[in-house]
């Protein structure tokens, strides 16, 4: 099916702040469907832009399709840090989580200074946020004894400092939670065939699912960022394949944006 051209997409919600960019994070478990979902969103409207997760950086592969990516010193030095983390989590979890968050901040800040500056009603969708970096993935690795106490303390201190420097620019206006069962995510991991992920056990996905549910569904997960407790959340059930349900999903997103 041919992809329709982007069209002008005035926001249904008038904003007294003019062209302030609305920032929405797309959250969910590994292989819940985030990449597919953001690819749908970026085709909808010329005032909508997405910042994909910088997996290419983590795998040391330069992606020519991603305007937010460029070859970095860490990439030039070699090393697939995503694969290294999955193969030896006790050795590489701290390194990976620190680099994952750094590369995410860099990509998201670059997007804020990109073409949306001239958009009439700009919306920027992040594929995950600095908050899920810390409170879902890094904390799970610490609780699984893949980070020791010293590493976890340093990571939290570093994360707090980075957010003090840049966090105000990345504060979210809303979150879209793509909710899928761990079993469905495991099946999708096999189907998409990313080499680094093929050894992920169901238990790992179950732990991540529990954390996502605590944070985004039950809202019982505590963070150091009080404003997150009040950030609006749209939960979408994505257990079924949604490639043929674009229109329904887009309407739900538009309705959600109209409330922000």
From Swiss-Prot:
Subcellular location as annotated: Nucleus
GO BP field: dAMP salvage; pyrimidine nucleotide metabolic process
Residues involved in ATP binding: 28-36, 188-192, 240-242
Post-translational modification, as annotated: Phosphorylated and activated in vitro upon phosphorylation at Ser-74 by CSNK1D/CK1.
EC number: 2.7.1.74, 2.7.1.76, 2.7.1.113
Principal subcellular localisation of the protein: nucleus
Modification Phosphothreonine, positions: 72
Gene Ontology MF terms: ATP binding; cytidine kinase activity; deoxyadenosine kinase activity; deoxycytidine kinase activity; deoxyguanosine kinase activity; protein homodimerization activity
Top class in the EC scheme: transferase
Catalytic residues in the record: 127
InterPro entries recorded: DCK/DGK, Deoxyribonucleoside_kinase, DNK_dom, P-loop_NTPase
Sites of Phosphoserine modification: 11, 15, 74
Positions bound to substrate: 53, 86, 97, 128, 133, 197
Similarity section: Belongs to the DCK/DGK family.
Protein task: Phosphorylates the deoxyribonucleosides deoxycytidine, deoxyguanosine and deoxyadenosine.
Self-association and partners: Homodimer.
Record's protein name: Deoxycytidine kinase
Organism: Bos taurus (Bovine)
Encoding gene per record: DCK
